[in-house]
Amino acid sequence: MRKTTLFLAVTFATSNAQGRALRSSSPATYGTTDGSDYILKTGYLIGNGKLGVIPFGPPDTEKLNLNVDSLWSGGPFEVENYTGGNPSSPIYDALPGIRERIFENGTGGMEELLGSGNHYGSSRVLGNITIALDGVEAYSKYKRTLDLSDGVHRTSFTIANRTTAALKSSIFCSYPDQVCVYHLESASDARLPKVTISIENLLVNQSLLQTSCESEAKRAVLRHSGVTQAGPPEGMKYAAVAEVVNPRSSVTTCLGEGALQISSRKKQLTIIIGAATNYDQKAGNAKSGWSFKNAKDPASIVDGIASAAGWKGYQRLLDRHVKDYKKLMGDFSLELPDTTDSASKDTSELIEKYSYASATGNPYLENLLLDYARHLLVSSSRPNSLPANLQGRWTESLTPSWSADYHANINLQMNYWLADQTGLGETQHALWNYMADTWVPRGTETARLLYNASGWVVHNEINIFGFTAMKEDAGWANYPAAAAWMMQHVWDNFDYTHDTAWLVSQGYALLKGIASFWLSSLQEDKFFNDGSLVVNPCNSPETGPTTFGCTHYQQLIHQVFETVLAAQEYIHESDTKFVDSVASALERLDTGLHLSSWGGLKEWKLPDSYGYDNMSTHRHLSHLAGWYPGYSISSFAHGYRNKTIQDAVKETLTARGMGNAADANAGWAKVWRAACWARLNDSSMAYDELRYAIDENFVGNGLSMYWGASPPFQIDANFGFAGAVLSMLVVDLPTPRSDPGQRTVVLGPAIPSAWGGGRAKGLRLRGGAKVDFGWDKRGVVNWVNIVKRGKGTSRVKLVNKEGDILAEM
């Protein structure tokens, strides 16, 4: 590292990074899953955490595909005495035999601990709200945008043969008021056409639905309610409303029970949309009989919410939404060059023309996708909602792929990679509450019944009803490391904010529970007899044998133990026996850092002669979790500065390929690789993978698909894309306890020259600091402005990738 100190803090005016928008000159379509017109390939997504909406359809029959976070089949709403997959009595007596066979042979089976996914359930769509306009079958000058500066979806068009009849609609979902709002407006003095509203879901048994219409001077509202099954037991209840704001200024008429017509309206029409279920996350415990049920009728709940919102009027609702949205979105921005006037073009055109073969990519589009990822997180995860699931908050189906659940062996983690560094830490409150309310209670049972362990545990696939046990196949279901990986997010949230009150009240209890589980589950290695502590049994996520000492698990437990000990500076744990046990176990823990005969990192502790640690192109990079997004290797083992480890990571990534193997061609596999290359300071390979992900997996509406450009839609790659971009902008690792001196943060470790002349604003650093910085045409950071200094006790040095010291604090 060069010691020359230069490049002082500089501040200059920047354009508004949040002025970017998704654009289209044609309406979104519903289509079919195997067609290019599929709704999740054409629609732009909006939401407020609890509610998710996809507007689609032509202007004469614009539809709002409506989702509510907790609308699920399965669980206690499908079967009496739902157990979350747990057995009715302990089965841990099988563990000693399982472990003995594995230590004796290197691998083995564990069928005795497997369960089933019966009554697991699935996230499901609520329905479509149709807003039909009379006499608008033919139209021109159609435009559709999702403005990422305010989160408002807008359309505009002109009715054919009526040159003065230009109409525009605006749709947004408000977190402050817990509703979505549809607003129709005439650009002239002409009256609005006759409007008819209806709510339907043709996918469900119609006998389970009920609609009603109310049309009075004081209130005009369409109500829709249903239940997921007739029972017994009775299924989950849900309800939706569409309410006209200020009905006195129009003539409203009920067309039977299923439609509401509005006529003689002047220039504007506003419709409030709300939805709710009788799911209660706080009732997922023994005290509540594991019911997850709210005794209140969701119809009355949503009716009250919509009525209260309606009294505020459109402008106040919009102002409150925009203020809340900008508070989260406006505090971070990335500014990359737009050398091809991409800002004025349809997003689908930009993506269609994007080519991996072009080494310069399209920086504007790459910037747009990062902004869209932040929008999607704000729209699908807020403090009073469930976390973002496999599809965020959006599905058009009753049975989306993998139930649109929570897969916790990369997908859920990737959803939140971008949160802490870009000022969206608030979105993670949904995650902490979900884990505390639904994972911990049942997971404590699972730990006891399956492992005879203290603490709590979950496995790979988790629903909203506390399914914490294993499903049927050890290859993917045997994954008790899920919560250990999630503890990285818990610690990072504290490390970036230094919110000690939160750590004391919620975060540390989660960490302690997982550390306790592993303290009572780790085994002394009887295969190598080296005295180390290892996991037995374990499966590396979705690949390889059931064995012991899987690299992935060992790295994650290493992180858990290290962060529990680091937390003592702020917690002052009274249970000194627990702290001593963690410290003692950490001294003996195999930390999962072993090199293979061909130079890569080993995925299994087994000798190479067993044939598992070959040059696999598998989609997962599980044995690199401690490199990125974690830091067991990159920080605690000093790997970021160690050439031997760097070379091993490089060999592993090279062998693993581009993320397009026969087992999957998923976007998330590619962006994970991009992030790992970035942590190697390799801008060329990081940018290659990022471009390849866009070219292969991203479709015309900016979403990423799983099988190349074919469904299913998985939102993790959208979020992971942003995480990869951030890893190209900064390497900011936690300080190892063994090295408490000055911490070095590298700004711009892997910025490609295609992004030359760009800048970032509002990037968060560990310890609570916030910085703005920019770089030259080569991608080398040449100025930094410290906007906010951190609360942490360690000193921080900011350098660029050439080793120049930019600032110290």
From Swiss-Prot:
Give me the gene this protein comes from: afcA
Does rRNA-binding show up as a keyword for this record? no
Compartments where located: Secreted
Task: Please tell me the species this chain comes from.
Answer: Emericella nidulans (strain FGSC A4 / ATCC 38163 / CBS 112.46 / NRRL 194 / M139)
Q: What protein family is recorded?
A: Belongs to the glycosyl hydrolase 95 family.
What protein is this chain from? Answer: Alpha-fucosidase A
Q: What class of enzyme is it?
A: hydrolase
Has the keyword Secreted been applied to this entry?
yes
Its Enzyme Commission number(s) read: 3.2.1.51
Query: GO terms for molecular function, please?
Result: alpha-L-fucosidase activity
One Gene Ontology term of the biological-process aspect is: polysaccharide catabolic process
What does UniProt give as GO cellular component? extracellular region
